[in-house]
Design a protein with these regions (language model features):
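A conserved structural/catalytic subdomain of Rossmann-like adenosyl-cofactor enzymes
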Residues: 1-187
Length: 187
């Protein structure tokens, strides 16, 4: 599990091509100079044999441009196993929510061609300055991850084709609505 710097700037193609072994390390493409999120992710993928889990800014799963093209190539290789949306205000340095992207180079047969999206944005205990994940919150997330199935208002298994139809946007909130339907009283 890694938590690299989010949206780190200054790591576009020109900078990354100066690195040793850049052809193997950045085989899915180069990110923009504005965000090195997918440079960090590709570095980890190039260094791993099986699974990688990355805590990263939510924009990493939804931004367009070069980042979308990198996501597309990684999806076409069927390397993304799960995207878990975490609550906001979990980290000291930002109030923004995060996602955990789980990559698996050796997906079991029952997970091939599929991605599990978990919307855990409401799974927290409120704190004064920060929210926290309780033991129960963590257990619920882990159980959903292990079961790899649809759970109403919490998780959804999508196909790579569905991700393609969503323009490679893997934001769990796009596929798993947690908003309660409002009930109106007649006037």
């Amino acid at each position: 599990l890694a938590n690299p710097p989010w949206n780190q700037d200054g790591y576009g193609e020109d900078t990354l091509k100066r690195a040793e072994f850049w052809q193997k390390r950045f085989e899915y493409g180069f990110p923009t100079n504005q965000s090195a999120d997918w440079a960090w992710i590709q570095h980890m993928l190039a260094s791993s044999k099986e699974k990688v889990a990355v805590v990263i800014d939510t924009g990493a799963v939804s931004r367009g441009g070069k980042e979308k093209l990198i996501r597309q190539k990684i999806l076409e290789k069927d390397l993304i196993e799960s995207v878990i949306l975490l609550p906001e205000k979990l980290f000291y340095n930002t109030g923004a929510p995060a996602v955990v992207i789980v990559f698996n180079k050796q997906k079991p047969e029952n997970k091939k061609g599929k991605i599990l999206l978990i919307n855990a944005s409401k799974e927290y205990q409120e704190g004064k300055k920060q929210n926290l994940l309780t033991k129960e919150n963590i257990q619920k997330i882990v159980k959903a991850y292990r079961e790899f199935k649809d759970i109403e208002k919490f998780s959804k298994v999508i196909t790579i084709e569905e991700a393609k139809q969503a323009d490679y946007n893997l934001s769990p909130s796009r596929f798993v609505s947690i908003i309660e339907e409002e009930k109106y009283r007649p006037l």
